[in-house]
Amino acid sequence: MIKLIKTATIATSGEMALAEAIKRVAVIGAGAMGHGIAQVFAMAGFEVSLLDIKDEFLKNAMEKIRWSLNKFAEKRRIKPEDVDKILARIKTTTSYEVAAKDIDLAVECVPENMDLKKKVFAQLDQLAPSRALLTSNTSTLSITEMASATKRPDKVAGLHFFNPPQMMPLVEVIKGDKTSDETVSTLVSICKKIGKTPIIVKKDVRGFVVNRVLGAVFVEAFWTLHRGEATKEAIDASVKYDGGFPMGWFELADFVGLDIVAETGLVMYKAYGERFKPCPEVIEPLVKAGKLGQKTGAGFYDWSKGRPAIPFALAGQYDVDRSWAVAVNEAAWLVYEDVATPADIDTGMKLGTGWPSGPCEYADKKGIDVIYNKLASLYNKYKMEFYNPCPLLEDYVKKGWLGKKTKRGFYTY
């Protein structure tokens, strides 16, 4: 049996005490993520102020929240009479003064632009009570830099929900350079109170946990396609039908949006260099042509008639262990750099992306020596940094920590 305590949605009495102090929440930005996050907090009993720059944006957001709540009622996840009660907990406004008044927590959900986010944080810092925690739902940008726009960097952190927030169980809690342990503990307890599973990102690194591991897998798949070693359909069929993943990598990229995948890829390349070397030949022509995936009806696949059919017959034409190897390698870097624990990484990948296993537990089951040798072989063949084994994996192999078969790997058995 694995000797570890998984992050869970059950809060301890100490955590509950921290969460109890949080009553009023401001959500800044009523777009897809913002209105979903506002709904999540309102469903958990919090009073919510939802802010955007135009009343029409707010009206649209409230209509979407009502639609979503009605769906919850249809599926008997809430009582029909609760719909109006939940909606009544959300007040909309275009005024920062109104939104920030007497709040205990703010969640910023504006577009991924650092200058814009810093302006939001500066305003919140000026107007919100000194006790209030200020958080960002960013998926790529620096929490530390946002905190620099405030006089309370100890109370600033990342609170990264996954899309759609009403349905996805995971939240990444990101610690900036000056974020206090109490702030992190409070946010962890709040996540549990709203029915989410939090994982702690101990350092303010680009991509946090989930997008970093996912980014490594995308890079490997894009280069494999570019080298002509497998078609996108063959890669996706193998990943889905042999690997048990919910989507193939190209299908997933289309679902996320190729503009977002390309933009995030550049952020990762800037942060980590050759380990995230982008493959512009694969993605740039599509982005330039406006083929951004599902949202535009075309990307790697044609989405005009719904989700593309990935032929089962093509499974087996791509070695899925290549995907696993680079995922394990990036997970090892996260552990090596003390960004996250193996348990939180595994929880993140399973709950944030629907993976059949976390990379650390997969490596322990497969054999860390097997993964290490796979990476070393690929690195010797291609001389590309994303195959270069992390020093942690080399260290584990030298120590004989090979996973389940030796009772010690990422976990102790």
Task: Label the model's feature ranges.
Residues 2-413:
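N-terminal glycine-rich phosphate-binding loop for ADP-containing cofactors
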